[in-house]
Amino acid sequence: MTESSGSTTIVLDFDGTITEVDLLDDLARRFGDSVVYQEVEDALLTGTITLRECITREYEPVTMPLDEAVGWVLANVRLRPGLRELVAFAKARRWSVRVLSSGFEEIIVPVLADAGVDGIDVLANRVDARSEGWRVIWRDEAVCAVCGEPCKRSGLPEGEVIYVGDGISDRCAALAARRVFATRGLARYLSERGLPHEPFDDFHDVIGALAP
């Protein structure tokens, strides 16, 4: 199926989608408190805390200076193949590309710049990297009428949305998209509910599926 031009946006999750490893998890596990990290991850999976509560508690023990964190990320991050090609593919069709993330703009923007990816919109949270513990500055406090929590759905643009994601933070937003490419936890979630989605391993798969 060919998408109509002019009002189509490819919306990309960042952690675990653009990156091969979930950096939000990796930073908290490596530079925070590993015991706290595991406790809140388990609580998130059982539904006893929200995603926001999880991220807040995981980053409270992180005291690493932000420039050191960015340096570590740039030295170690691996991006999913085909990102630049997907952005070029979208631009050639006059589609927009938006990164919509539960992570931190202060991490995402340097990663994209280092990878030579520019001219795309980034919608993410911010972080106040205090020496006594990182404090998350949430992008949007509005509660979603669908899932009952503040979520990524509020960050979706108008028009047709092609959503590409991998995890818990992508669930509600993906349900609002016209077309969904999913991997890992998001793919399992949608499959268990019989909801339509297309699997992908890298962004070349997405390009191949979208190309006329």
Which residue ranges define each predicted feature?
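C-terminal cap/substrate-recognition subdomain and adjoining C-terminal extension
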Residues: G82-S96, G103-P212
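Alpha-helical substrate-recognition element adjacent to the catalytic core
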Residues: T2-R126, R130
